[in-house]
């Protein structure tokens, strides 16, 4: 019996999406690994777009960050689904200032459909009541924080260890669900705050050590700056 040949990703460069070789390559993968799924849940709560283009049957992922090391790390996590390396992208913001980011994306694949259908409704991310209790792990929380977390107090001399998760893209009611269940599952004392009338999750100073210990094992070195104080 002949052993099935493994298709190398390098052989796909320059091929169109309808290439037989690409279609055969995709068939080698069926589902996300546990690490990939936990990572992606945090990414979707953050900055990653999971979308289905009109011509596609399945979902794909789109990544965009300023931090090159971080996008390179994420591309490695989803390596088998990403053909091309991150590319530099320049644009001007609403103030006319130049913004430089790095972009990458996966090809569309059925492995993303489970979370695509779970999170997306009418092309918009939604929060379901069982998300935190049934899906979010410490790893998910860490990637959510690396994507869309930061410090509360930007005073350089501050001793305030409070943190925030930026959830401005979600409804107030959805953020309240997230807060309630994060507090239950991880024994936190999060509360809701508002930034320009949009809801964000506030992690108080007294929770810093607990939160640090939850996420620190998964924070990559280039993103450690987000954890302001060592424990």
From Swiss-Prot:
<keyword id="KW-0540">Nuclease</keyword>
<dbReference type="GO" id="GO:0006314">
    <property type="term" value="P:intron homing"/>
</dbReference>
<dbReference type="InterPro" id="IPR004860">
    <property type="entry name" value="LAGLIDADG_dom"/>
</dbReference>
<protein>
    <recommendedName>
        <fullName>Probable intron-encoded endonuclease 1</fullName>
        <ecNumber>3.1.-.-</ecNumber>
    </recommendedName>
</protein>
<keyword id="KW-0378">Hydrolase</keyword>
<dbReference type="InterPro" id="IPR052500">
    <property type="entry name" value="Chloro/Mito_RNA_Process"/>
</dbReference>
<dbReference type="GO" id="GO:0004519">
    <property type="term" value="F:endonuclease activity"/>
</dbReference>
<dbReference type="GO" id="GO:0000373">
    <property type="term" value="P:Group II intron splicing"/>
</dbReference>
<keyword id="KW-0404">Intron homing</keyword>
<dbReference type="InterPro" id="IPR027434">
    <property type="entry name" value="Homing_endonucl"/>
</dbReference>
<keyword id="KW-0255">Endonuclease</keyword>
<dbReference type="GO" id="GO:0005739">
    <property type="term" value="C:mitochondrion"/>
</dbReference>
<dbReference type="Pfam" id="PF03161">
    <property type="entry name" value="LAGLIDADG_2"/>
</dbReference>
<comment type="similarity">
    <text>Belongs to the LAGLIDADG endonuclease family.</text>
</comment>
<dbReference type="GO" id="GO:0045292">
    <property type="term" value="P:mRNA cis splicing, via spliceosome"/>
</dbReference>
<keyword id="KW-0496">Mitochondrion</keyword>
<comment type="function">
    <text>Endonuclease involved in mitochondrial 21S rRNA gene intron homing.</text>
</comment>
